[in-house]
């Protein structure tokens, strides 16, 4: 029985994780749930799952949740950075699902890794912002890091077991691997007239053809920044060189990624586009459990298609790949700028095509600095956010 803490419990990954847990009640126990400010959602989860702890990042939300919990509920409500650190490092916490979207998830995820926990990594920003430091800390603490992102989980499943055991430090070439093929659907605007992209609305950007995701990740999919961040993640997870990574547009989202070997073989991981599959894989690794997902029906799929990414259509993807080449400072700045830009787009303050413009201008402002600690990274993140806000003010 694994005691699990879910960071981002009220989001889509949190919901999928709880669904897998309900399917496998003898194997997993909900020990702690963490959310930002969604009181009603957290209240319902506490009543249903009866966790020992419910942590709200927002202090007022924590007070409201505490007042609403029925007397029979055993859950203890906490708030504050110290309480969150105590929860993820608690000796009774076995596994941490890191699913808080954005830079907000970096510190608790890093704390869990530092404590040597089994960390199921759904938070892209942990590696985008602190990849080298993150993987070094995991190695030093003995933490187990398993990738939840469907693409990285697919790559992981296609790798030899000895490579799986050396994430962050594996030698792909020595194991006969020539390329990692990172697939992406191309999002809702894959075939949209380029001249009309500036008029696309948040609702249109969030209408993904295959996946059910939160608003921020949906917009990132529409710009393909999502794939760019995954490109950076893959660099750190699988210790790749830029020439070993390729992005492939695959609109059907059936092949979640592939590994190409020196002998000409290509191993692909396939399945219906449902996050419960990679979540269940990580939760039970190296075993397999039921995820509640319908098996892939090849007769219904019919055909699979592929194409190269168009960087005129997806400039954010190019920016992310360039930032990956520049180093950790650039990827940290790009991530921060993108979060501010996407939030502004979702609030109707900038156009869809302005997202790439904001990202480019912020990335262009990167100054070389050493990032030796989480504090250094968070300071640069804060500076980049301020720069993004300033850039956006010139667009209005």
From Swiss-Prot:
EC number: 1.1.1.267
Catalytic activity, as annotated: 2-C-methyl-D-erythritol 4-phosphate + NADP(+) = 1-deoxy-D-xylulose 5-phosphate + NADPH + H(+)
Ligand binding (Mn(2+)): 149, 151, 230
Keyword Hydrolase: no
Pfam families, alphabetized: DXP_redisom_C (PF08436), DXP_reductoisom (PF02670), DXPR_C (PF13288)
Sequence positions that bind 1-deoxy-D-xylulose 5-phosphate: 124, 150-151, 185, 208, 221, 226-227, 230
Protein's GO biological process: isopentenyl diphosphate biosynthetic process, methylerythritol 4-phosphate pathway involved in terpenoid biosynthetic process
Binding, NADPH: 10-13, 123, 125, 214
Keyword list, A-Z: Isoprene biosynthesis, Manganese, Metal-binding, NADP, Oxidoreductase
Molecular function per GO: 1-deoxy-D-xylulose-5-phosphate reductoisomerase activity; manganese ion binding; NADPH binding
Family: Belongs to the DXR family.
HAMAP family cross-referenced by the UniProt entry: DXP_reductoisom
Protein name, per record: 1-deoxy-D-xylulose 5-phosphate reductoisomerase
Species in which this protein is naturally found: Shewanella frigidimarina (strain NCIMB 400)
């Amino acid at each position: 029985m694994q005691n699990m803490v879910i960071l981002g419990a009220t989001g889509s990954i949190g919901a999928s994780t709880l669904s897998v847990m309900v399917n496998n009640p003898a194997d997993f126990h909900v020990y702690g749930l963490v959310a930002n400010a969604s009181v009603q959602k957290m209240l319902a989860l506490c009543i249903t799952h009866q966790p020992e702890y419910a942590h709200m990042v927002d202090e007022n939300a924590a007070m409201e949740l505490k007042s609403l919990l029925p007397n029979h509920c055993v859950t203890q409500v906490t708030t504050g950075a110290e309480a969150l650190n105590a929860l993820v490092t608690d000796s009774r916490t076995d596994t941490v699902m890191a699913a808080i979207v954005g830079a907000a998830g970096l510190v608790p995820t890093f704390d869990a890794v530092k404590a040597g926990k089994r960390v199921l990594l759904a938070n892209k920003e942990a590696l985008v912002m602190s990849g080298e430091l993150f993987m070094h800390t995991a190695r030093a603490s003995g933490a187990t890091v398993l990738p939840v992102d469907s693409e990285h989980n697919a790559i992981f499943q296609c790798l030899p077991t000895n490579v799986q055991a050396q994430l962050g430090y594996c030698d792909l070439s020595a194991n006969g691997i020539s390329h990692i093929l990172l697939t992406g659907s191309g999002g809702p605007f894959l075939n949209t007239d380029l001249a009309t992209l500036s008029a696309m609305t948040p609702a249109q950007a969030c209408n993904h053809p295959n996946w059910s995701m939160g608003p921020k990740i949906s917009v990132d999919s529409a710009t393909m920044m999502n794939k760019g961040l995954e490109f950076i993640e893959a660099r750190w997870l699988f210790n790749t060189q830029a020439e070993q990574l390729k992005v492939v547009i695959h609109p059907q989202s059936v092949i979640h990624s592939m590994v190409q070997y020196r002998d000409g073989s290509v191993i692909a991981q396939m399945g219906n586009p449902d996050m419960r599959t990679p979540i269940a894989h990580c939760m039970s690794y190296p075993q397999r459990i039921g995820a509640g997902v319908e098996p892939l029906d090849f007769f219904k799929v019919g055909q699979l298609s592929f194409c190269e990414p168009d960087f005129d259509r997806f400039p954010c993807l190019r920016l992310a790949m360039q930032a990956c080449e520049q180093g950790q400072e650039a990827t940290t700045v790009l991530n921060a700028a993108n979060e501010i830009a996407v939030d502004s787009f979702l609030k109707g303050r900038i156009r869809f095509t302005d997202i790439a413009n904001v990202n480019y201008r912020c990335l262009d402002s990167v100054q070389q600095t050493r990032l030796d600690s989480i504090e250094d990274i968070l300071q640069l993140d804060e500076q980049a956010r301020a720069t993004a806000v300033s850039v956006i003010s010139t667009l209005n």
